[in-house]
Amino acid sequence: MAPTTYAGPSAGLPDQTALHTGRAVFTEAYAVIPRGVMRDIVTSALPHWTQTRVWIIARPMTGFSETFSQYIVEVAPGGGSDKPELNAEAEGVLFVVDGELALTLEGKPHQLRAGGYAFLPPGARWTLHNTSSSPARFHWVRKRYEAVEGIELPSAFVTNEQDVAIRWMPDTRDTWGTTRFVEPDDVRHDMHVNIVTLEPGAVIPFEETHVMEHGLYVLEGKAVYRLNRDWVEVEAGDFMWLRAFCPQACYAGPNRFRYLLYKDVNRHARLGL
């Protein structure tokens, strides 16, 4: 198997001679935020974080995607936070794509390297710092947890994708699979953040059209992706943001194609707006 790689934002600025022929688009059903538009001037700081900047690539928006936010966070050496999450109802997933981070979760220390994954239930006590000599980057997916009477909160856990086997879809000859960090039938969880892998030339062979919202961040490779009525070229470092019921399908390119996938799951549909 080829070495695992993880793409990140371009940062910097394009040259003044650059042409405006990029792929960024925002439609009624989906958005594509290419890597090339994730530049320094669109980053933000966060309260109680030091030497840190974030690209906020998704947030709840009425009439579009309403359930989650997603950040790409870059922490310089010596940076981090002792008070990272200000919303007591928020659950989160951290997924490290570059560098090394020191996570303390419920009093226990963990070292997160590329591929490192941490699930943080609402109310979890955690801190995060970059104690190394190089910048670190991670994805932070946040959702307001939907508690259900009689169902306990999910437990915090830390792992690395290298320690989790890919589960291949049936009848795909091991060419389309998912790295699942949570069992699908564990109804304590109301969101999944997985990694989808398509081997070269593999396809999603039908237009998935379903209630789940999606954030898809391309970790490596390239593909042609069906989004609503359009076929869109995407590559490592691009982000696709889908509202509920946006049709989607995929043809993978000449190399392995992988993306980090958010979806909301395991709860009744709300009956009010």
Please place each PLM-identified region on the residue numbering.
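Surface-exposed interaction/gating patches
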Residues: 158-225, 232
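Conserved short histidine dyad/triad with adjacent acidic residue
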Residues: 51-60, 69-88, 179-184, 194-210, ...
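Short acidic-glycine-tyrosine-enriched beta hairpin
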Residues: 107-122, 228-244
